[in-house]
Amino acid sequence: MSVSFGRPEALSLVHRSGAVLILVLGVACSPQPPASETASSTPSGAGTVADDLSPQTLAAGRDVFRFDTFGDEQFWTDTARMHEIVQKSVSAAKALSVGLKVDADAIPPDVAAAIKAGKVDLNDPATTVTLLKLNAVVGLKGVISTVNGKDNLTRLGITCALCHSTVDNSFSKGIGHRKDGWPNRELNVGAIIALSPAITPAQKAVYNSWGSGKYDPRFNIDGKSTPLVLPPAYGLTHVANETYTAEGPISYWNAYVAVTQMHGHGNFSDPRLGINIRQTPDMVGPKLASLRAYQHSIEAPAPPAGSFDTEASVRGRVVFNQNCITCHVGANNTDNNSGVLHTPSETGQDPAYALRTANKAYRTTPLRGLWQHAPYFHDGSAATLQDVVTHYNNFRRLNLSVAQQRDLVQYLKSL
């Protein structure tokens, strides 16, 4: 996600400071990015050759995804001053209420037992600082100094996991084992940004209007607000281009987000965006290969047992193949792997966001793990899979019967 502090005047911030994270947005330097990633096919040298899937590389990539800020404390601490707010007024209860998650595996057994017993004050900001000291807040990285027995949060940054990981709630709501790649649809990014003392009341109003699970990755560029649903970061192995508008492959996306959105200390250049950021040392580029390898290793989650009607899904697959497969083609159910994009008028989608992008069109969304990440469409305008089917049945005049629509929904749940 991108934290923006204004409009054209915020463009200077785009070049040196920042935004919250959403692994979205990527505008390739060619009208249609190629399906494969090479160093010559993506800007800023972001492309890579085939993934190194060794255990060492995957472990390194996992650590980057979960814990690496790329030096973005230069924005979140020095500019946004978020550490001050967290230290003074963000209790653990408040953090959980805006969708932040806690990694139960990072909490020592004695602390976990104390929380269970109600002996830890979740309404005290000091508890949040303690959780940061334990490296237990998913997607946040703090530096703690202890003076006269008191822990003080002196630096704060964000990681990829902030928006693209959640937990299984196995300990309690908001606390559990990590689920990397799952979008945190409970995360209220705008409300978090609005806590910053460095933004204006007008900006706070925009941020607070987004709601949970949404973020606008261009607000800091053009000042317009059409927030998007946080996308999943799993099942990406054979997906050519990321983001709702397919503006770049995964390595471009990671470089763009790390430098211009998270505001990490690294290099990114794209003349089409008017961005040319060069920072020494480069704390982003050397980590892109392992990060991509780890992301490619995250498989889409299988639907839970009993979550769909098996017999209906078999019938629904027939309906799908007769009506949907022209666009949702191949193993990952997207024709964008062949370079195809669709104008809003082709799909009946709101054009507002697409018109702000280089491609002015939307990608056919891959469908693996579809059951997990409601709401649907780029703007979350379809609350359920039934809403998706109803939309296309009406817009494309498919004339599906009620039974066919129900079967199709069950098939989509099975993917």
Stretches with model-predicted labels:
Residues 25-28:
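C-terminal motif of bacterial Sec signal peptides marking the signal peptidase cleavage site
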Residues 1-13:
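N-terminal secretory signal peptides that target proteins for export/translocation
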Residues 31-62, 67-161, 165-173, 177-292, ...:
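Electron-transfer interface patches adjacent to heme c in soluble/periplasmic c-type cytochromes
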